[in-house]
């Protein structure tokens, strides 16, 4: 053995020892060192190790009473194909603590033990801990007794940081992977997976009397485990004592129980006392058992659920019955077991599978006859189920994840044998769900929401403070049904949340509707107060609701009648961006004209070819102040052309180019534009005046995309537009002595004109709308001053322009927008931006022999809008 290894191991042993007195050391080959101290034994690894049998000396020390610490020092320990026939061949700790820690990778794979032997790792009368390890893998291990991989009186799995997996372990007894009296699965950084473990008796993955699973900051997965009771976890007690059989899942990041199964009770979990609180999302999906599809609570036990940092979901869990086959079930409460509370704070509690509570008067559970116990007697002293939620959270019972064939009474009915107290927040029944309980009380600040088609049944008198019926659930056949000996409801109202589109229902609301059923009562009950017909403001169809009672031999029905008036389009439909596209074209053509005017200035040359990058940013907001009327436009492209500039300041320019643009409003609509541009410019100069003229032609193809938030489909459409613009300019140059900041300045005035039209079109997908053709014409009068500076020494040319622009005449024509599915139309006019504007432009040109570079920056400020343009170009002069 290397001396430095020996010294390091001695140091570790000294640190761990309170007395630092060494009784002896036992090398384990070249891999590890056993150090005997007065109070404990330390096994220290100093290299990676792979083995098919454990160190005999390590197993011998494990059988002694002193605590044993196995330290990995960030090395790997791989144990595989270990077949134990004698406890002396395993980590068998009858007394004292056993700790395995600080391994980079710890693996026990394909190991097995006979019935007379314990698990691969076994501890009794002490504490077993696996902590501070990187990755851990316990796979395909088997025990003829209990605990396929690990068995212990007290076991803690803590502070592990990479990945932990217990997969495909099995046992003939309890705990396919782990069997313990108490188990702490806490404060791990690593994701933890229990997958495809199997136990012949209880707890496919874990079987223990008390389990605390808390503070794990990465997901926990329990998938594909199986057992007789508790497909994934079993925490029950043979003795009827409250301190036994408890399971606590608290403050974990995310937890998934999926595809676990039990032959008898608890597809995912079978426990006596269970608390689920302050976790991230917790999901129970596709679990199955004979009793308790996801969770079964032992007789005399309790269950409490608090959705703290994420929702709790029960979906597609089922229990097997002899006469009904598979029946959906989330939770089964055995005789005298209670569901103490459902509390939704920062997440919802969603039951897409029903709850069943066994009647105290029954001798054994009969899950195939759920309806027979609807009105079974309940002692007056039964503990109530307390339901509380925050303002925007709900406890939801729903069958919306069921197919029509699966919507049978057993799959729809949640049967409770204890009173319900709705203290605060929202209790929601959706999509034909049925809730049955001995009684239900509702505090004034709480809200009961029942969709049409759902039912509430109580065996005692029912007094409700507020009942809300969601508008989106209404149709001409289904209604809310309430069964109670006597019923009183202080307030009934129709609700429509902001993200629902009930008033967009063309089939139901575009015409007058009579006899829409809202609420059905038994004939023994009396009429209730009619709902309030006054509606809050909304988009879509506008109209009036009226209500009345209709009596029949079957009972009383509350009937709603609808009288339509008009239609107010949803803001997501009201896009003005299409009409305002002509403003974008106008701004782009101004940027092109600015670039062409720049080419007309500068040094003289006989003939030149040039090219330039052109960019334009245009921001606008209408005076309405609505986000839908605010938009911005960006374009980038190029121009290339030929030009000449004489010594007498005569000039001529011919150019063509392309711009690619994208526009979007402050809402959900965007357009992409491809523009093709051609322009010509000429200037004549005299000693007293310069006269120039310019004409520009633009043809564009536009594509509209609408990413609806309130409607399901994305809208798409395309259209074509054509625009022409021109200007005539007269300027009077004044030459200074050339010694100042500028060598000359000019006073100028222009007459500018713009005319643009765009075709009407229909969208090809989404909420299909038809947009009318529109046009925009504008005549303006810019006036201002320019300053020039030519430097012969540096061959630089500077040019500054400042102008005031007054629009003389503006003419806008635009038609309505039509929603084709109901032929409703509305106006989406073009924005009326200010008729006054200010323009500033700064240009620099520099001659480099035959090349001439160009930089042009301009800014236009107008009431409710402003734009920037930047051009970079070069000219080759012949």
Swiss-Prot record:
It comes from the Bacteria. The lineage of its organism: Bacteria, Pseudomonadati, Chlamydiota, Chlamydiia, Chlamydiales. Its main location: secreted. It is a peripheral membrane protein. NCBIfam families: POMP_repeat. It comes from Chlamydia trachomatis serovar D (strain ATCC VR-885 / DSM 19411 / UW-3/Cx). Keywords: Cell outer membrane, Cell wall, Membrane, Secreted, Signal, Transmembrane, Transmembrane beta strand. Belongs to the PMP outer membrane protein family. Residues 372-381 have a biased composition (Polar residues). Residues 360-381 are annotated as: Disordered. InterPro entries: Autotransporte_beta, Autotransporte_beta_dom_sf, Polymorphic_membr_middle, POMP_repeat. Residues 360-371 have a biased composition (Low complexity). PROSITE patterns: AUTOTRANSPORTER. It holds the Pfam family Chlam_PMP. This is Probable outer membrane protein PmpI. GO terms for cellular component: cell outer membrane; extracellular region. Residues 1-24 form the signal peptide. It is found in: Secreted, Cell wall; Cell outer membrane. Residues 602-878 form the Autotransporter domain.
